[in-house]
Amino acid sequence: MTAGHGQAAHTGDVAIVRYTAQVWGSRKAQAPLPEMDAQNQIITVGGGLTLPALDRAVENQPAGTRMLVVAPPAAAYGETGNKRLGVSGTDTVVFVVDIMQVIPAHATVHGEQRQAADSLPQVRIDRSGAAAISVPDADAPRELAVERLVDGTGQVVKAGQTVVLQHSSAVWQNAQGEDRADLFMSSHADGRPLTVVAGGGNVLKAWDRALVGQRVGSRVLVVAPAKFAYGAHPPKGIPAGAVVVSVLDILAGA
């Protein structure tokens, strides 16, 4: 319908899209589906985490594109449909999709980076965009520490808002005194940014606290004592009581 001229969306990239949807061939076609009237959605391109029709349609399309997508049941809600939206297992769904923004898989924030306080880990960004974290040869802070290293200029992140992050995390105790900590978690290693709901309780408590109130475009250092990280029951490979050091790049919000 309209050709865009922005960044093209490739596998591993994140696309922020805005769409409306209607059911083909029924009275429902006179009005958009409930809760799908010009709603923003964040899609990890090629990730298989959204409707197949949208995933396929967005790939290789540039930001600024508006497209018409006709999705038969197999590419929309499948044989079971979606009762909440009023879509049956035999319904074809028509989408009008606007690609608002494309965030490359290895994007980072831009801006002058400040040095963290001497008592906190220091951060460098390598050529891949991943954070190189240098942990002091000292005991970790007992309380949550959040320090903004790069000032973003975008919207302020609100509780409940979906945001797109690059992240790198290390365990303080495992890396104490090391110039470059081993990362146990990294979106750059995963090959795609992470989408989270700020303050939604689905990530570390420290991240939830650190994200809300920051501006999009910020880089934030988070040092999380165990009570704000994994506590006494961490995942495999992380010691109980671990202090987690994370570097978060807030790339976008929807």
Question: What is the role of each PLM region?
Answer:
Residues M1-A254:
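Cross-family detector of peptidyl-prolyl cis-trans isomerase
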